[in-house]
C-alpha cells in the first residue's frame, strides 16, 4: 500500500559504482539550464523537521519503494528525487534514455522533469514513447516546462496553449501533472499567463502550476492574482545547491515558506563537482561547463569536498548522495532535480532517498559552504 508523507527518506551504495561526474551539458543548441545531467520508511520527518542526532546510513535494497511524498497542497505523491531529462535526445539517445528511465522506475522514482525546449522536444518524445511502451503513465508524475521553445517563445496566452498541446502530443498523454513556466516573461502580463493556464486546467490538460527562475517579488504578485481566482503556483524550481545558496536562502526561501511552495532545486550537483569527479583542472574538459566547474576549484570547494569525503567514508555512500541529502533536509525542499549520463549513476542519486544527515553533519556542511 502506498504511503504518503510530507518529505524525507534512506540506501546503500557500492563503492565500485560509476561515479557521477557530469550533471548536465552546459552548451549546445537546445541547452536549457534545468534538470541536471549528471522501501518506504514510516519515520520520515515533515518538511523542515530537525535532523537526527546521528547520520542514518542507507539500507541495502534494490526493490521499488512504495513511499511517496505529497507535494504541498496538491494530490500528487512523488519520489524524493526528480529525474532531470535535459540530455534526453541530445547526449543520450533512445537506448540509453530508456535504460535511465527504467532504472529510475525500478529504484522507486516516479517524478520526471522535462521541458519542451530540451533537445527541441525530443526529450518529451522519448519520455512519452517509454511511458506508452511500459504502460506506466499513471505511475508517473510528469512535469514539463514551457516558455523557451523557439516555436512557442514566451508566456503569451496563445503561445501557452500551443505549447501545452504540442507537449501533450509528444508526451502521448492527455494531461500534464505539473506545468512549469520555464522563464519569467516580463513582456507579458502575469495575469494573461495565469488566465491561459486556468483555461487549460478547466479543460483537464494541466493539473498544477509551477514557477522557475521567478524572483520573490513576482511570486508575491502571482499570489495576489491567485487570491482573485487565478491559478496559484504550487511548486518552485530554482538553482540551489551546497555551492549556490545565497540566491535561494535569502528572499526566495522566505516566500516559498510563506506561500507553501514545494521547492525543486536544480543544479543540485553543481555540474558534477559535488559528485567528487573533479579535483583538479586537469580533470576538466575545456568548455563552458568546464569553466563553471573550474570556478569551484578553490579553497571553499576543497573545504566542502573534504567534509563530504569524511561523511562518505563514515557511511559508505557516494558524494552525490550526500549533496542531495543535504538539499532534502532543507525547509520546503520537495525533490531535487537530478540528471545522469548513465543508468548506473542513478544508484547514488536515489540512495539520497534513504539517507539522512545528522545535525552535526548538516552544521559542518553549512559552515563549509557559508560564503557564496
What do the PLM-derived regions correspond to, one by one?
Residues 102, 128, 132, 161, ...:
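Solvent-exposed, non-membrane alpha-helical residues enriched in polar/charged side chains
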Residues 4, 36, 40, 63-65, ...:
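Beta/alpha (TIM)-barrel catalytic core signal, keyed to glycine-rich beta->alpha loops juxtaposed to Asp/Glu
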Residues 84-95, 146-158, 182-187:
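Active-site mouth loops of central-metabolism enzymes
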Residues 78-82, 110-111, 139-145, 175-180, ...:
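Structural preference for beta-strand elements that scaffold enzyme active sites
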Residues 2-12, 19-140:
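N-terminal binding-site loop/beta-alpha segment at the start of enzyme catalytic domains
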Residues 107, 170-171, 204, 259:
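Structural motif
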Residues 168-189:
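Active-site groove signature of glycoside hydrolases
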Residues 92-104, 155-170, 219-223:
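Short, acidic/polar
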